[in-house]
Regions:
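Noncatalytic alpha-helical scaffold of FAD-dependent oxidoreductases
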Residues: 1-453
């Protein structure tokens, strides 16, 4: 009996071999596509479905690619020939919400924004807010260790997960972590799985750490600067002053101009970079006033509003970055992080690389935590070698400045060739050994993160 026959025999009509499903599973939002269609898509509805799929895959040594909404930007969920796609989007229930304990138990397929809309009814929220929050799943957020605009103040996914239910490659179900605020029993396998991009197991449930909804007004600040370096230095000055905005976003001149063009807004002055900042909590007005003072002292033209609608409009300009880039051509959206004080130097490096390669690299940044998203624009579907060469220089520049290859998008298959440069050979090999402990047969998402684990 073939693998496909075994899947159909045990799982029935949740096994999908339609051309549409198979084509969709070849790509994510990175622009990269696998070389061919996978074997089948299993639309799991229960933990038992996941376990059955993994047992069949293990018995037949068939590779499995776990997939949520396919909104990733590093190719981690792209499936190719001979692989089973295990889709978790149908596992989208909220199993439990405990406002008294500030926790929720959810299945992996629920969308980030859908979860928070439901949680808001009980006065709580889950803090990670990636730009894809309207369309990305909690399972995908966990797989990549996602962040977002609010993470400088409220943390990333790793700060907001208490426990995970994990199906291993052989189909066994593990319950990792705890429901309590504290817990140091044994090794922290929950944190190990977060950000592992489907290499260690299949997340089928998550116990999430919630927060109370933040009460009171929210202030929004915009500040314009004559150069992106000045804007980056001003954002570092805000942090150095001991101020903690909820959101601090930076748009360089090219990204700001592209978004204004997309939204039919008046064109900014040439070379203008912009900071968009949001404060919240009991001290929001005082914090905003102090931040405005720092920005003006740093040479910025700053304005503040406490009008909620205007604040959302201003943040909407930043959130329109991805469609603005898509309007310019095919986009390789990159993701590096550096210490916040090194952001001006990182923008200097980007300018150097632009000049050396004769290209434009529109860049936005989560300035509150030093996470930059340079965008490489090109024609066609495949990334040209020259663009990869420029990206490689950019990655190495981030490493030289004490940073990292990825702050929130993950390694996937697009950055695996540079991973050993950051980790060093010993740590790279140790991490590959850890993958083999969880998945001795190497059937979970092979070729991703570690090209040959």
């Amino acid at each position: 009996m073939s693998v496909l026959e075994r899947l159909r025999s045990e799982l029935g009509d949740i096994v999908d071999t339609s051309a549409e499903a198979l084509e969709q599973a070849r790509a994510d939002r990175s622009g990269h596509r696998s070389p061919g269609r996978p074997l089948a898509v299993v639309h799991a509805r229960t933990v038992d479905d996941v376990q059955s799929t993994m047992r069949i895959a293990s018995a037949t040594r068939t590779p499995v690619v776990v997939r949520g909404a396919g909104t990733g930007l590093a190719g981690a969920a792209n499936a190719g020939p001979g692989q089973i796609v295990l889709s978790l989007t149908a596992m989208d229930r909220i199993l439990e919400v405990r406002p008294d304990d500030l926790l929720a138990v959810v299945e992996p397929g629920i969308l980030n924004a859908t979860l928070n809309a439901r949680l808001a009814e009980q006065g709580v929220w889950w803090a990670p807010d990636p730009a894809s929050r309207e369309i990305s799943t909690i399972g995908g957020n966990i797989a990549t260790g996602a962040g977002g605009l609010l993470c400088a103040k409220y943390g990333v996914v790793r700060d907001a997960v208490l426990g995970l239910d994990l199906v291993l490659a052989d189909g066994r179900l593990m319950h990792l972590g705890h429901r309590s605020v504290k817990g140091v029993t044994g090794l922290d396998l929950t944190s190990l799985v977060i950000g592992s991009e489907g290499r260690l197991g299949v997340v089928v449930g998550a116990t999430l750490k919630l927060r109370r909804l933040v009460a009171g007004p929210v202030c929004a600040i915009t500040a314009s600067f004559g150069s992106v370096r000045d804007a980056a230095a001003a954002s570092a000055a805000v942090t150095a002053a001991g101020l903690q905005p909820a959101v601090m976003e930076l748009m360089d001149a090219r990204s700001l101009a592209a978004v204004h063009d997309l939204l039919s807004l008046p064109a900014p002055a040439p070379g203008t970079a912009q900071l968009t900042i949001q404060t919240d909590g009991p001290a929001t007005l005082d914090d905003a006033a102090r931040i405005v003072a720092v920005l003006r002292a740093s040479g910025g033209v700053a304005d503040m509003t406490s009008d909620p609608a205007e604040g959302e409009r201003l943040l909407g300009i930043r959130r329109s970055m991805h469609p603005a880039m898509a309007a310019l051509g095919t986009t390789l959206i990159e993701d590096v992080s550096v210490p916040r004080s090194a952001m001006p130097a990182m923008f200097d490096e980007i300018a150097r690389i632009e000049q050396a390669y004769g290209i434009s690299i529109p860049t936005v940044a989560h300035a509150g935590d030093g996470n930059l998203h340079p965008n490489f624009i090109f024609d066609g579907e495949e990334v040209p070698p020259r663009i990869w060469d420029a990206a490689g220089e950019l990655f190495r520049a981030a490493l030289r400045l004490g940073g990292t290859l990825t702050g929130e998008h993950g390694i996937g298959m697009l950055k695996s060739r540079w991973l050993a440069e950051e980790l060093g050979e010993d740590q790279w090999e140790l991490q590959r050994q850890i993958v083999r402990v969880f998945d001795p047969l190497g059937i979970l998402n092979p070729g991703k993160v570690f090209s040959d684990a």
